[in-house]
Amino acid sequence: MVHQVLYRALVSTKWLAESIRSGSLGPGLRVLDASWYSPGTRQARKEYQERHVPGASFFDIEECRDTTSPYEMMLPSEAHFADYVGSLGISNDTHVVVYDGDNLGSFYAPRVWWMFRVFGHRTVSVLNGGFRNWLKEGHPVTSEPSRPEPAVFKATLDRSLLKTYEQVLENLQSKRFQLVDSRAQGRYLGTEPEPDIVGLDSGHIRGSANMPFMNFLTEDGFEKSPEELRAIFQDKKVDLSQPLIATCRKGVTACHIALAAYLCGKPDVAVYDGSWSEWFHQAPPETRVSQGKSGKA
């Protein structure tokens, strides 16, 4: 059963429940809870300890990142990522299923899906509908901690799926890539503040289009169909046959653009990891666009 879905970006709650019932969890199939919430709201690790998908390990994105960077969620090194996921029992032969508990149905899970892909691991899927629908459908949960046997994971960075500040700056001149921002429209325009952060005005990179990631999800928290997703890209005049860079505030919801494009048959969307957090502090003022009070971000 597992081998039929190794390269699928999404797996259903029904499929995962059947896999757990059939005893498929182990070195060949691992489940990760990648929940993260803004400070002062929900506590991701505490909620995981109280209830999670049976056999799931907690993927702490605060630990699996570049903690030396001044920006929020920058990728860790190859060695850091390899050691971290290896400690969760994941090898290069493991099919990884990622979910989170966000009320939208999915928030941080696509970021972890992309992290695995950018480090060379293709057998990774997002649980469609997330923990929200796992609970709604009455699938089993447990508070029992997962203790997988450590595994060896070799990480190889795929630079084609990652863009740096310098590359995005160069792209303003070359225009080789389309640039799409996944934040809510008000933050993109600069008319609404960036939440939970001081010293970061809202706005966007000059020349970027706006595709709020929430539009990729149904009201019930599932990914929309490939046909619906293609229509969203077409409506924003984003050509899926051409190179594409996704950006947001810190490289998280940009991964929803990468996932949506993947579901439309485009697996090569690159994510600007530093995104607006880095751009705001590094880029020339004329490359930052805002309709806020100052007119510039």
Curated annotation (Swiss-Prot):
Keyword Transmembrane: no
SUPFAM superfamilies (UniProt xref): Rhodanese/Cell cycle control phosphatase (SSF52821)
This protein's UniProt keywords: Acetylation, Glycoprotein, Mitochondrion, Phosphoprotein, Repeat, RNA-binding, Transferase
GO BP: rRNA import into mitochondrion; rRNA transport
Classification via SMART domains: RHOD
Post-translational modification N6-succinyllysine, affected residues: K14, K136, K175, K224, K237
Pfam family, one: Rhodanese
Compartments in which it is found: Mitochondrion matrix
Region annotation (Hinge) ranges: 144-159
List of residues that carry N6-acetyllysine: K14, K136, K163, K175, K224, K236, K237
Phosphoserine modification, residue list: S38
One GO term describing the cellular component: mitochondrial matrix
Reactions the enzyme catalyzes: thiosulfate + hydrogen cyanide = thiocyanate + sulfite + 2 H(+)
UniProt: substrate binding residues: R187, K250
EC number: 2.8.1.1
Catalytic residues as annotated in Swiss-Prot or TrEMBL: C248 (cysteine persulfide intermediate)
Residue positions the entry lists as glycosylated: S35
UniProt keyword Nucleus present: no
Domain Rhodanese: 25-143, 173-288
PANTHER family xrefs: THIOSULFATE SULFERTANSFERASE (PTHR11364), THIOSULFATE SULFURTRANSFERASE (PTHR11364:SF6)
Domain notes: Contains two rhodanese domains with different primary structures but with near identical secondary structure conformations suggesting a common evolutionary origin. Only the C-terminal rhodanese domain contains the catalytic cysteine residue.
Assembly information from the UniProt record: Monomer.
Name this protein carries in UniProt: Thiosulfate sulfurtransferase
Species assigned in the record: Cricetulus griseus
Lineage: Eukaryota, Metazoa, Chordata, Craniata, Vertebrata
Gene: TST
